[in-house]
Amino acid sequence: GSLEMLGIDRRDEANIDEMYKLGAQERLRELGLYPTFVVTGNMPVVLRESLLPKAFDMGERTVEKSIDLFGGMIGPFCLETIVTDQLEFKVFEISTRIVAGTNLFISGSPYADMLEPGMSTGRRIAREIRSAQKSGRLHEVLS
C-alpha cells in the first residue's frame, strides 16, 4: 500500500470551542449556557512541522494494518484525532470515506500541492479510476 496526505482540518463544534473565552463555567451555567459539541464546520490546518512525522507514521500504520486485516483500503481515509498538550496524537475515529479532513481543500492543500498543484481529493480519485480503467484493473479500485 501507499499513503498520500491530501489535507488536515480542525473541526469546529458549536460553542465548546469558544466557551473558555466567555468566563467562569459557574457563571455560564447561571446564564443557561452549557457546552455543546454540534459540528458547525471545519477549518483547514497546516500542521506544526514537528508533528508531521507522527502524522505520517499513524497513516502508514493504518495502511499496513488494513492490509494485514482485510487486504487493504481503497480510497481516502481520515484519522480523527486530538492532540494532547504533550503533542501526542490520540485517534478516536477512522473515517474510511470522503470527509472534511480528506476533502476540505477544493483546489488542493499545501500537502496535496506537493503531489501536484491544485490536486483535490476528487481529482485524485478520478485519476486513480482513469488509470485503472486504461490498464484493465478497474476491479481493483472499485468496491
Regions found by a protein language model. Give the residues of each.
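Cysteine/selenocysteine-centered motifs that mediate thiol-based redox chemistry or coordinate metal-sulfur cofactors
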Residues: 123-143
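ATP-dependent carboxylate/phosphate-activation module, predominantly the ATP-grasp catalytic core
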Residues: 1-65, 95-122, 126
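Conserved metal-phosphate-binding beta-hairpin within the catalytic cores
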Residues: 64-103
